[in-house]
Amino acid sequence: MCPTAVPSRVSPVAAAAAADIAGSSESTVSLVADVDKKNSQYKQIFLERFRKKLQSDKTGMNNLESFVELPEGVAPSAASIGPIKRGSEPLPPWIKLKVPKGMTHRPRFNRIRRSMREKNLSTVCEEAKCPNIGECWGGSDEEGTATATIMVMGSHCTRGCRFCSVLTSRRPPPLDPEEPEKVAAAVHEMGVDYIVMTMVDRDDLPDGGASHVCCCIHTIKKKNPELMLEALVGDFHGDLKLVEQLAVTPLSVYAHNIECVERITPRVRDRRASYRQSLQTLEHVTKWTNGNMLTKSSIMLGLGEEEAEVRQTLRDLRTAGVSAVTLGQYLQPSHTRLKVSRYAHPKEFEMWEKEAMDMGFLYCASGPMVRSSYRAGEYYIKNILKQRQSAEGGKAAAAATAVNAGTAIA
């Protein structure tokens, strides 16, 4: 039936109303079509003008290539290096996850995983869903150094940072008194010369688990005396006496992550952690050990920070005496965690690495896939530690010579 056709039993008034409605609908459709046509014309005009503007631009800063490569003579900045992409969009091409290779390619990967399973130990590599697990566990190349980050005091954390995928619990299971021996044995079986040991926060324990961590460190070093050991630890409620207990253990590197810039810390980290408390922890380690302990921290990008804030965070860490720093891209581990605000371009990470080294950091690893323990045992940082050990050995030898000379004179 035609839309304007009206049954004979309908009154003339109703028929007239129906005709008006039909006419109105047709005019509305016509109006929408006219608007769409005009919008399309305006769009074409805008695109033509925009293309002409790009062609006539002499600065080199307003073309698409400038998002990837900066024009010569233009200083890099976080804003000029690359576009912002939000978490709901596809990952940019520079975010690539490395799939772990099999036994024939990375026998160390399987050996580390098997050792962890047999001793019922946790690794932050697995619990935090680190994208670099294949590279670190298997070594960065055929001759690379395999590195694993063992997580002590269980797999449940008492804090609930909004970026972290580690399980949380107000009342985690009790500590395993055999864990120090298990960890030491696992490290020995791995056959590595550098290991990272981290911890879950245990606010349910009076000392935050500091004594247990110290026991693990001493046991590991006793069974593996030549091992270089990095401990990535919490803030222990801000209790500096507990920090001192760890600082005097035979550690090679004392690491504590500041995580993000100060402004967004309250919405990113658990309320019991704070930016200033983390800085105080790192600074106290440096002062307590007279600068002899190498300290390290890490910053995530992509949480809503500004360029000036990242720069200030680097300055704050350096002022606190931190010697090594890592910067990496935050990736949302699950839909319940914070969303990514942007994906920083690799050029931006290169910029931060240069600025960090210019500020006086001894070591900086900066890249989209870098994490706090990423390639922790790589050559450069190991070389720093060996140089420090040699210097300390030289001082000890000189002191012994002076004592012997004094005895001979007496």
Swiss-Prot record:
It is found in: Mitochondrion. Pfam families: LIAS_N, Radical_SAM. It comes from the Eukaryota. Binds 2 [4Fe-4S] clusters per subunit. One cluster is coordinated with 3 cysteines and an exchangeable S-adenosyl-L-methionine. It catalyses: [[Fe-S] cluster scaffold protein carrying a second [4Fe-4S](2+) cluster] + N(6)-octanoyl-L-lysyl-[protein] + 2 oxidized [2Fe-2S]-[ferredoxin] + 2 S-adenosyl-L-methionine + 4 H(+) = [[Fe-S] cluster scaffold protein] + N(6)-[(R)-dihydrolipoyl]-L-lysyl-[protein] + 4 Fe(3+) + 2 hydrogen sulfide + 2 5'-deoxyadenosine + 2 L-methionine + 2 reduced [2Fe-2S]-[ferredoxin]. GO terms for molecular function: 4 iron, 4 sulfur cluster binding; lipoate synthase activity; metal ion binding. InterPro entries: Aldolase_TIM, Elp3/MiaA/NifB-like_rSAM, LIAS_N, Lipoyl_synth, rSAM. Keywords: 4Fe-4S, Iron, Iron-sulfur, Metal-binding, Mitochondrion, S-adenosyl-L-methionine, Transferase. GO terms for biological process: lipoate biosynthetic process. Its EC number is 2.8.1.8. Gene3D superfamilies: Aldolase class I (3.20.20.70). [4Fe-4S] cluster 1 binds at residues 125, 130, 136, 373. Pathway: Protein modification; protein lipoylation via endogenous pathway; protein N(6)-(lipoyl)lysine from octanoyl-[acyl-carrier-protein]: step 2/2. Its cofactor is [4Fe-4S] cluster. GO terms for cellular component: kinetoplast; mitochondrion. SUPFAM superfamilies: Radical SAM enzymes. Residues 140-362 form the Radical SAM core domain. [4Fe-4S] cluster 2 binds at residues 157, 161, 164. Disulfide bonds: none annotated. Signal peptide: none annotated. Belongs to the radical SAM superfamily. Lipoyl synthase family. This protein may be expected to contain an N-terminal transit peptide but none has been predicted. This is Lipoyl synthase, mitochondrial.
